[in-house]
Amino acid sequence: GFVALLKKLPLILKHLP
C-alpha cells in the first residue's frame, strides 16, 4: 500500500547520514 511506503520513508531517512 501507499501508506506503508510513507511509513517507510522516515525509516529510510534515519539510515541516511
Swiss-Prot record:
Keywords: Amidation, Antibiotic, Antimicrobial, Fungicide, Membrane, Secreted, Target cell membrane, Target membrane
UniProt key word Aminoacyl-tRNA synthetase: no
Signal peptide residues on this chain, from the entry's feature table: none
GO biological process, one term: defense response to fungus
Positions carrying Proline amide: 17
Chief subcellular location: secreted
Tissue-wise expression: Expressed by the venom gland.
Entry's Gene Ontology cellular component terms: extracellular region; membrane; other organism cell membrane
Coiled coil region boundaries: none
Cellular compartments annotated: Secreted; Target cell membrane
Function: Antimicrobial and mast cell degranulating peptide which probably acts by forming pores in membranes. Active against Gram-negative bacterium E.coli NBRC 14237 (MIC=3.12 uM), against Gram-positive bacteria S.aureus NBRC 12732 (MIC=3.12 uM) and M.luteus NBRC 12708 (MIC=6.25 uM) as well as against yeast S.cerevisiae NBRC 10217 (MIC=25 uM). Has hemolytic activity (at 100 uM). In the context of inflammation and cancer tests, is weakly cytotoxic to normal cells, induces calcium signaling but does not impact cAMP production.
Family: Belongs to the xylopin-like family.
Protein name in the entry: Antimicrobial peptide Xac-2
Organism: Xylocopa appendiculata circumvolans
